[in-house]
């Protein structure tokens, strides 16, 4: 009897222990990792804003949240998602397209078909700025006449260089025929002002301080090039990534006319195997609390439900798609997951 009692006691204790372990594991699994970028950019503070929102609005009632971590940016984030070291990540749209198709800088890793979209966050607006006397058409066709001209395409191996090359390739422009400079945004603006370069490519949220500075100094001596609808299609190269963006007149000093340019999304990505209900609740919470996010970081002021799926490069996670359908948003075929 004593042995039976002892075995029964041990059995109960083991069951309790295992139950506790499983519960702890389940709880840990619902503290999702959100990969961002370096702490000095926009990705990290926006990631912290999303994580803070989840801890305030979702953790108390629904028992899950996000924790933001810094990273080397979009390229590493795709790797972290693929290895399940992160369950959510902020990605540049082009890197999302490259990951999904196994192309570009991510070709070696192969197609990442476990990748899903949750929401567009804010857009990188393309500013192809050149000297006005070189802007004969006022559109990106003028880039075709810039052979041997000095042009800053962004820092080497940066997202700026990657997106610039992608766009120009679609337009039939070979940037390697330019006299290229590999400068950051501020340095590009300085070089344009002092005559070291004739043009620059700056994709960022509007208004961009570097472009503001260049316009304040040079006024109508420089011009942001327009994209026609056909040029937007060519720039996309089949990606459905860049969408129309109008820079209103007087956004920059001396910019008296609106500019019809294009923009690609920075977007919230997720693994396809994440719990549908969790992704649904996160998406719903984001759009019901935009004012909360706006108070933490100004980049989120560009977010709106009307723009939530603009330019997304990979199919939506079913949880996000469910929320958008509830809100009456029509989801195009290429964003519906198999």
Language-model regions, residue ranges each:
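Bacterial N-terminal signal peptides that target proteins for export
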Residues: 1-11
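A structural signal for short loop-to-beta-strand junctions that line the ligand-binding cleft
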Residues: 108-127, 251-259
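Bilobed "Venus flytrap"/periplasmic-binding protein-like clamshell domains
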Residues: 31-60, 68, 124-194, 306, ...
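An extracytoplasmic/periplasmic, membrane-proximal ligand-sensing/linker region
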Residues: 187, 204-219, 224, 274-338
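Alpha-to-beta junction loops
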Residues: 82-90, 149-151, 194-202, 218-222
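Pocket-flanking alpha-helical
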Residues: 56, 67-109, 186-191, 206-215, ...
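C-terminal segment of classical bacterial N-terminal signal peptides
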Residues: 16-25
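C-terminal lobe and pocket-closing loops
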Residues: 216, 222-281, 323, 327, ...
């Amino acid at each position: 009897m004593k042995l039976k009692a002892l075995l029964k006691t041990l059995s109960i204790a083991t069951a309790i222990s295992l139950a506790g372990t499983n519960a702890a594991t389940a709880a840990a699994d619902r503290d999702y990792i959100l990969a961002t970028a370096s702490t000095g950019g926009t990705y990290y503070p926006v990631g912290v804003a999303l994580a803070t929102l989840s801890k305030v609005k979702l953790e108390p009632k629904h028992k899950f949240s996000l924790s933001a971590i810094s990273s080397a940016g979009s390229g590493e984030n795709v790797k972290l998602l693929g290895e399940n070291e992160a369950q959510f990540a902020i990605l540049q749209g082009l890197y999302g397209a490259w990951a999904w198709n196994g192309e570009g800088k991510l070709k070696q890793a192969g197609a990442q078909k476990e990748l899903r979209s949750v929401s567009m966050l804010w857009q990188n607006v393309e500013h192809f700025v050149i000297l006005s006397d070189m802007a004969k058409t006022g559109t990106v066709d003028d880039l075709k006449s810039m052979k041997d001209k000095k042009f800053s395409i962004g820092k080497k191996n940066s997202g700026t260089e990657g997106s610039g090359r992608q766009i120009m390739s679609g337009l039939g422009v070979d940037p390697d025929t330019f006299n290229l400079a590999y400068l950051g945004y501020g340095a590009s603006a300085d070089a344009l002002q002092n005559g070291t370069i004739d043009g620059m490519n700056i994709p960022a949220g509007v208004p961009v301080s570097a472009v503001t500075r260049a316009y304040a100094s040079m006024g109508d001596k420089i011009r942001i090039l327009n994209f026609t609808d056909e040029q937007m299609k060519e720039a996309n190269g089949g990606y459905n990534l860049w969408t129309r963006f109008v820079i209103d007149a007087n956004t920059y000093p001396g910019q008296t006319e609106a500019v019809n340019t294009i923009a690609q999304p920075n977007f919230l990505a997720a693994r396809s195997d994440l719990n549908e209900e969790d992704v649904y609740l996160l998406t719903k919470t984001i759009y019901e609390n935009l004012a909360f996010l706006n108070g933490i970081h100004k980049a989120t002021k560009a977010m709106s439900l009307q723009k939530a799926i603009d330019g997304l490069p990979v199919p939506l996670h079913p949880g996000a798609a469910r929320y958008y359908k509830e809100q009456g948003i029509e989801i195009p075929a290429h964003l519906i997951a198999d």
